Curated annotation (Swiss-Prot):
Family the UniProt entry places it in: Belongs to the GcvP family. N-terminal subunit subfamily.
Protein name: Probable glycine dehydrogenase (decarboxylating) subunit 1
GO-annotated biological processes: glycine decarboxylation via glycine cleavage system; nucleoside metabolic process
CDD domains from the UniProt entry: GDC-P
One Pfam family here: GDC-P
Keyword Kinase: no
Protein task: The glycine cleavage system catalyzes the degradation of glycine. The P protein binds the alpha-amino group of glycine through its pyridoxal phosphate cofactor; CO(2) is released and the remaining methylamine moiety is then transferred to the lipoamide cofactor of the H protein.
Catalysed reaction, written as an equation: N(6)-[(R)-lipoyl]-L-lysyl-[glycine-cleavage complex H protein] + glycine + H(+) = N(6)-[(R)-S(8)-aminomethyldihydrolipoyl]-L-lysyl-[glycine-cleavage complex H protein] + CO2
Assembly mode: The glycine cleavage system is composed of four proteins: P, T, L and H. In this organism, the P 'protein' is a heterodimer of two subunits.
Length: 456
């Protein structure tokens, strides 16, 4: 156990104090059969220069391809100022600012983040973030069950077009909560929820309805019809949305006749790098009437005894603070650092900048789909309108195509067949604002070459 502060004399003094001859004596009660012998083969440590060289050698093994993968994780341009500011010592922590008098800067930033999320979603109150989009949706389902006092069944309808990983997370979290999750089928021609399958539950006791917009396939759901159905059926409506899309699409507060009750989603597009899958953050917002059922924590603005504006942790009904059975959530912290980056990102871009990003994403994906569907053997899988990703169907094995694209330096998309067997040989592709016309042309040219080999 060599720690840098421990000099040989320090180690000898401590061993003498406990009556041991050497370090190994500290483990003499562990049978030799249980002790790992491989530690002896671990090489000696290296110096900083050698370590940097080794890191560079390992980094060179990475393949930096052109990315057309979406499926819940999106490559967006992040202004350099975002992480320059977020990495300042005053902000560089993911932990909770419990000591309000010493954390006004962090608390104000979190308060401003909540305000921005409310402006995006059109809701009245937001919490200070969740772990990621999947857990945010799972917590939204639990919140909906608590809110719906009319329901006695705890049955939750989830559209089959919700991200499959999100649905798996929901199943895991609610499994022991006496909640029944029912997955609605989707229209395999349109790529959106089959409204007829939802209509079959009219008049039945349904606790909550989960709607994704855009859905996993990038298609735009009939959110007005579905939200109005939920309202008339006394069902709590939960929207799972992409925050980038909210700069262009109708906000969830305006869906249907009365809007949704809860809005949540993945915040990664707002200034967080893809980073091999995380860390990310989730957002959740709702109406003020439901604030005491909201999970996580909420930052509020108040005044001190001198009348000066201040910020504090206003609500945090978590199992750390109250009886576990009465808590709204077991989430005990928040993704403060990622939220910091998101707040800076949204502040730098502003409403107009976010709208430009969303518009460019939409245009690039349409240009990509136009170019790809001109190739023989490639067609658009669904007819419904899409935002910034879409599903294409290939007449060749998708895994082989993906491998050949990868060999050409292109991350060609995500194959959903592992979650949807009926969608064999389809590919979910995405083109955000960072993809240039040259990138799209290269993808189309490479795919055309690959598809032409079939007849050779």
């Amino acid at each position: 156990m060599p720690y840098i502060p421990h000099t040989p004399n320090d180690t000898k003094e401590m061993l003498t104090a406990v009556g041991a001859q050497d370090i190994q004596d500290l483990f003499d009660e562990i049978p030799a059969s249980l002790q790992y012998a491989g530690f002896q083969s671990i090489p000696a440590g290296i110096n900083e220069m050698e370590m940097l060289k080794e890191a560079q050698n390992q980094a060179q093994k990475n393949r930096n391809g052109i990315c057309f993968i979406g499926a819940g994780c999106y490559e967006h341009h992040i202004p350099a100022a975002v992480w320059d500011i977020a990495s300042r010592g005053e902000f560089l922590t993911a932990y909770t600012p419990y000591q309000a008098e010493a954390s006004q800067g962090t608390l104000q930033l979190l308060y401003e983040y909540q305000t921005m999320i409310c402006e995006l979603t059109g809701m009245e109150v937001s919490n200070a973030s969740m772990y990621d989009g999947a857990t945010a949706l799972a917590e939204a389902v639990l919140m909906a069950v608590r809110l719906n006092k009319h329901s006695k069944t705890n049955r939750v309808l989830i559209t089959g077009t919700v991200h499959p990983f999100y649905r798996e997370t929901i199943e895991t979290i609610v499994r022991n909560q006496h909640i029944e999750v029912i997955t609605l089928p989707f229209d395999e021609q349109q790529g959106i929820t089959d409204f007829g399958s939802l209509n079959q539950y009219t008049g039945e006791d349904i606790t909550a309805l989960v709607i994704a917009q855009p859905n996993f396939f990038g298609c735009l759901e009939q959110v007005d019809k579905m939200t109005s159905w939920a309202h008339h059926n006394k069902t709590i409506s939960v929207a799972c949305v992409n925050p980038t899309s909210l700069a262009l699409l109708k906000p969830p507060c305006s869906w249907g006749e009365h809007g949704v009750e809860i809005v949540c989603g993945e915040g990664q597009p707002l200034g967080s790098p893809m980073a091999s899958g995380g860390p990310y953050f989730g957002f959740l917002s709702t109406r003020m009437a439901h604030v005491r059922q909201m999970p996580g924590r909420i930052i509020g603005r108040t005044v001190d005894k001198d009348g000066k504006t201040g910020f504090s942790l206003t609500l945090q009904a978590r199992e750390q603070h109250i009886r576990r059975a009465k808590a709204t959530s077991n989430i005990c912290t928040n993704q403060g650092l990622l939220v910091t980056a998101a707040t800076i990102y949204m502040s730098l871009l502003g409403p107009e900048g976010l709208s430009q990003v969303a518009t460019q994403c939409h245009q690039n994906t349409h240009e990509l789909i136009t170019a790809l569907t001109q190739i023989e053997g490639v067609e658009l899988a669904f007819k419904a309108p899409f935002f910034h990703e879409a599903l294409i169907k290939l007449n060749q094995p998708v895994q082989s195509v993906l491998q050949q694209l990868a060999d050409a330096g292109i991350a060609g998309g995500y194959a959903p067949e592992q979650h949807y067997p009926q969608l064999a040989n389809t590919l979910l592709v995405c083109a955000t604002e960072v993809r240039s016309a040259e990138d799209i042309a290269k993808y189309a040219k490479t795919l055309k070459t690959i598809m032409s080999k079939r007849g050779a």
